[in-house]
């Protein structure tokens, strides 16, 4: 569970927790051990839950989760006004589906915390699963989520991501927000590739591998090359993360910038892995066409909505 310790101190030692009273009210060691293993909560709280529910592990577990949720929402309310200037981008690709999410927190220390990273992965997986509910015509489908829409997404057990966010806040002890997400789904011969930077940490799940970092990119491409060159396609994501192109560009409409350092058109930019060629030349060598892309930078100021950005990129790529 996201909130594995919703009380920070155990009031008794492990020996005291296991010691029964000798009477009918004593705790069974097996029940205490099972509840502790299943929930991850402290021995003190597992003991308290079992005592309240006459050693019924099921009822004790339910009570623990309810207490954790209540404390999480209480903490979330108290810290809601605190700024969340740090955080992570999560990028998850599975087959023809992709999701990129941004979550924010108060400190870089928490952003490096495994609990926070797992929650980034959880949100990315929820967004990826949402794409399964959508059928569409055409080659590429994209959908942006703002903070409100993300918080209202429901998980399989019926809770919202907002509920899970409250649990996270209770666990990490500081404010956190789910800022935005973007889903991709490709049809026909289109493929997706994603990348997070710097030195991405991978969080494994049943949905795939979520990369987390301060920057992220997802690229939709079409390739007629007989062999799929993952490293090359990843390098295009790295190019987009590092050089921040504003559009893909068209050879017959977009002229290269006079100063190559000012180039914002992807196909005319200097290729990061080979300064002697442009990205466009590298793409031609690999029989690859970039159809669409999107870039996230953690904490970046965005005046336009995701929907507006999607529309403008679609128009510029046509």
From Swiss-Prot:
Domain of life: Eukaryota
A Gene Ontology cellular-component term: mitochondrion
GO-annotated biological processes: mitochondrial translational elongation; regulation of mitochondrial translation
Record carries keyword Transit peptide: yes
Pfam families tied to this protein: EF-Ts_N, EF_TS
Listed CDD domains: UBA_EF-Ts
Transit peptide range per the UniProt entry: 1-18
Recorded coiled-coil stretches: none
Single GO MF annotation: translation elongation factor activity
Subcellular localization(s) per the UniProt record: Mitochondrion
Keywords, ordered alphabetically: Elongation factor, Mitochondrion, Protein biosynthesis, Transit peptide
Matches recorded under InterPro entries: EF-Ts_dimer_sf, Transl_elong_EFTs/EF1B, Transl_elong_EFTs/EF1B_dimer, Transl_elong_Ts_CS, UBA-like_sf
Subcellular location, principal: mitochondrion
Disulfide bonds: none
Primary role: Associates with the EF-Tu.GDP complex and induces the exchange of GDP to GTP. It remains bound to the aminoacyl-tRNA.EF-Tu.GTP complex up to the GTP hydrolysis stage on the ribosome.
HAMAP family registered for this protein in UniProt: EF_Ts (MF_00050)
Protein family according to the UniProt entry: Belongs to the EF-Ts family.
Protein known as: Elongation factor Ts, mitochondrial
Protein's organism: Drosophila melanogaster
């Amino acid at each position: 569970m996201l909130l594995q310790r919703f009380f920070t101190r155990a009031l008794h030692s492990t020996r005291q927790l296991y010691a029964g009273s000798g009477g009918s009210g004593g705790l069974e060691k097996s029940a205490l051990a099972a509840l502790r293993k299943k929930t991850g909560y402290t021995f003190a709280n597992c003991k308290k839950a079992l005592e309240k529910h006459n050693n019924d592990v099921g009822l004790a577990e339910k009570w623990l989760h309810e207490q954790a949720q209540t404390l999480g929402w209480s903490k979330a309310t108290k810290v809601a006004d605190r700024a969340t200037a740090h955080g992570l981008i999560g990028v998850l690709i599975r087959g023809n589906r992709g999701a990129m999410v941004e979550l924010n927190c108060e400190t870089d220390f928490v952003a490096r915390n495994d609990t926070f990273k797992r929650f980034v992965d959880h949100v990315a997986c929820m967004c990826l699963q949402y794409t399964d509910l959508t059928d569409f015509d055409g080659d590429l489908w994209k959908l942006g989520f703002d903070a409100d829409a993300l918080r209202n997404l429901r998980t399989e057990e019926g809770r919202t991501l907002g509920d899970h966010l409250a649990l996270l806040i209770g666990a990490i002890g500081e404010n956190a927000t789910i800022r935005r997400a973007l889903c991709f789904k490709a049809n026909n011969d289109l493929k997706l590739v994603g990348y997070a930077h710097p030195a991405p940490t991978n969080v494994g799940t049943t949905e795939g591998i979520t990369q987390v970092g301060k920057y992220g990119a997802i690229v939709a491409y079409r390739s007629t090359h007989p062999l799929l060159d993952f490293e090359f396609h990843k390098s295009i994501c790295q190019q987009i993360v590092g050089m921040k192109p504003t559009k893909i560009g068209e050879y017959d409409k977009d002229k290269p910038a006079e100063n190559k350092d000012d180039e914002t058109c992807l196909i005319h930019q200097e290729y990061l892995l080979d300064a002697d060629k442009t990205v466009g030349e590298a793409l031609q060598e690999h029989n690859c066409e970039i159809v669409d892309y999107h870039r996230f930078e953690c904490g970046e100021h965005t005046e336009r909505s995701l929907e507006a950005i999607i529309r403008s990129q679609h128009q510029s790529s046509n």
